[in-house]
From Swiss-Prot:
Family to which the UniProt record says this protein belongs: Belongs to the ribulokinase family.
GO biological process, one term: L-arabinose catabolic process to xylulose 5-phosphate
EC number(s) recorded for this UniProt protein: 2.7.1.16
Keyword Nucleotide-binding in record: yes
Pathway(s) of this molecule: Carbohydrate degradation; L-arabinose degradation via L-ribulose; D-xylulose 5-phosphate from L-arabinose (bacterial route): step 2/3
HAMAP family: Ribulokinase
Key word Kinase present: yes
Annotated InterPro entries: ATPase_NBD, Carb_kinase_FGGY, FGGY_C, FGGY_N, Ribulokinase
Keywords recorded for this protein, A-Z: Arabinose catabolism, ATP-binding, Carbohydrate metabolism, Kinase, Nucleotide-binding, Transferase
Record GO cellular component, one term: cytoplasm
Catalytic activity, reaction form: D-ribulose + ATP = D-ribulose 5-phosphate + ADP + H(+); L-ribulose + ATP = L-ribulose 5-phosphate + ADP + H(+)
Protein's recorded name: Ribulokinase 1
Length: 538
């Protein structure tokens, strides 16, 4: 019997799972919130801009070291039976490192410099740089963005590098390496400077044929090609291949052997596709968490407007992985719940429910034909299909009689409408959707949300019996590179979890939600395309 370890780094916490490679059974789990949290309001007493989201790299390494030690001790498995480790990470999260792979913000003279810290995926301080990159491409060579939806997102690697170049050049000068946080951890585990094709393919303008797009970079800034060559270039390892053996340092720390193979890191949502087993053409997977990432696999590459990327071999070898996304989903539900009147909070406590659970209970009783509230789900900007992080959310249709649960239900519905905009974009560009796999912890907890999605999308929605799909997907990658099965597809088939439940669309609800979607789309196009300045905060 052999085991693998999957390490899942989300927005707020890290999780380490020890998993049986024969059937995907989770043997031991370690979960820890990041001690420093997300740094978004102030840094060491200095106020930060509203769109800054930073983190502390020591949180990642402490979870790595403590978590693996814990699951090994807790499970009591033979260390020789551990064959591989996989890591997923929320992306695009960027770390700036010195020559010794030490994060720059750990240097005392840079501890007050925000641009020396980890830039979390939802850090939107690089919007001006992203807008400029799009303008350059439109003017010089629009084909540069053919496979990025003809957009540049401020969350990606190159805009964030340019942001530091423009706002804190001393940080850029002192950095020897700039890499995704997932690549940073894999490089530590292997004692190599490694890049995953998944991360740089989707977030770094890199493809398997040409490498980095240096022509594009030079048109943006003449210094950018050299910055990328010296600080970002290194051997690229594809998903499904081994990044290397576990380094002697970690062998000694954990009591493991050199046979342990390390997978290149995979973006967390992409790992969720593996975790739920949605690895065939026509399977559409929204990985629903803090935000939502929408993934599809297809043997062909199509230039789809407003879809944020397509990369070969980034999830399953031989297939192109397509990605789109919504910048806030679980965050939206938490935001809505945080606004609940005190009387609702008191009732929730009286009934032994969380405020989210109580609001959902009330929202489930609101018939669709009575819903008159519409929300634009742009509280953290719009990733797809508008790719504009400056857009802000809106609520329409309020009256003096509107109950709070109707507003909360409108938040749930808005995320389904946003997902439908994305699904239609795929289907209108020769990538048909047959089945929807809802991944992540939220679909397990919220049958109401899954029911809304099934009827808004007019598709069967399959929920897998695992709220840990991303961590399980990472463990699958560890098992695969460790040699548990001949191929990654075989690994997934053996280790995926069973179906928890399926939700079929109902004709009456589908018809009712089509009317609400038309209202959402009209507002979406009006405030997102025709008059976006009305949604901007100056």
């Amino acid at each position: 019997m052999t085991y693998s370890i999957g390490i899942d780094y989300g927005t707020a916490s890290g999780r380490v799972f020890l998993v049986d490679t024969t059937n995907g059974e989770i043997i031991s789990t370690y979960i820890k919130e990041y001690p420093h949290g997300t740094i978004s309001e102030s840094l060491n007493g200095t106020e930060l801009p509203h769109n800054y989201f930073l983190q502390h790299a020591a949180d990642y390494t402490s979870i790595l070291e403590e978590g693996v030690q814990y699951v090994l001790k807790d499970s009591q498995v033979d260390p020789k039976s551990i064959i591989g480790i996989g890591i997923d990470f929320t992306s695009c999260t960027i770390v700036f490192l010195d020559d010794d792979f030490k994060p720059l913000h750990l240097h005392p003279d840079l501890e007050d410099q925000p641009h020396a810290y980890v830039k979390l995926w939802k850090h939107h301080g690089a919007q001006d740089e992203a807008t400029y990159m799009k303008q350059v491409s439109d003017k010089v060579n629009p084909s540069w963005l053919n496979f990025y939806g003809h957009n540049v997102n401020s969350e990606w690697m190159i805009p964030k590098i340019l942001e530091v170049k423009n706002k804190a050049p001393e940080v850029l000068e002192r950095s020897a390496y700039i890499m995704e946080a997932g690549d940073y951890l894999v490089s530590l585990l292997t004692d190599k400077n490694i890049r995953s094709n998944c991360g740089i393919g989707f977030k770094g303008f890199y493809n398997e044929t040409d490498g980095f797009n240096y022509s594009f970079f030079e048109a943006i800034d003449q210094e950018l090609p050299e910055i990328v060559k010296t600080k970002c270039e290194s051997p690229v390892v594809n998903i499904g291949e081994s990044a290397g053996s576990l380094s002697p340092y970690y062998q000694n720390l954990w009591g493991l052997t050199e046979q342990v193979q390390i997978s290149p890191y995979i973006i967390d949502a992409h790992s969720g596709v593996l975790g739920v087993g949605a690895i065939e053409q026509g399977e559409f997977t929204p990985v629903i968490g803090t935000s939502t990432c929408h993934l599809m696999l297809d043997p062909k590459q199509e230039p789809i407007p407003a879809i944020t990327g397509s990369v070969k071999d980034a999830i399953i070898p031989g297939l192109y992985a397509y990605e789109a996304g919504q910048a806030a989903v679980g965050d939206l539900f938490n935001y809505s719940a945080s606004l609940a009147p005190k009387s609702y909070v008191d009732q929730a406590e009286k009934q032994g429910l969380s405020i989210l659970g109580y609001l959902e209970k009330l929202a489930a009783d609101i018939s669709i034909d009575k819903q008159h509230v519409t929300v634009l789900d742009w509280h953290n900007g719009n990733r797809s299909i508008l790719s504009d992080s400056k857009l802000t959310g809106s609520i329409f249709g309020l009256t003096l009689q509107t109950p709070f649960e109707m507003i909360h239900k409108a938040y749930l519905e808005s995320t389904a409408f946003g997902t439908k905009m994305i699904m239609q974009q795929f289907e209108n560009n020769h990538i048909p959707v047959e089945t929807v796999y809802a991944a992540g912890g939220i679909p397990i907890k919220s049958e109401l949300l899954v029911d809304i999605y099934a009827n808004v999308l007019n598709k069967e929605v399959v929920v897998i019996d695992s709220s840990n799909a991303t961590a399980l997907g990472a463990a699958m990658l560890g098992a695969n590179v460790g040699g548990a099965y001949p191929t990654l597809k075989e690994t997934v088939k053996h280790m995926k979890q069973p179906v928890y439940y399926r939700k079929q669309p109902e004709a009456k609800k589908v018809k009712q939600y089509a009317l609400l979607f038309d209202r959402y789309k009209a507002l979406h196009d009006l405030l997102g395309k025709e008059y976006p300045q009305l949604s901007y905060i100056n």
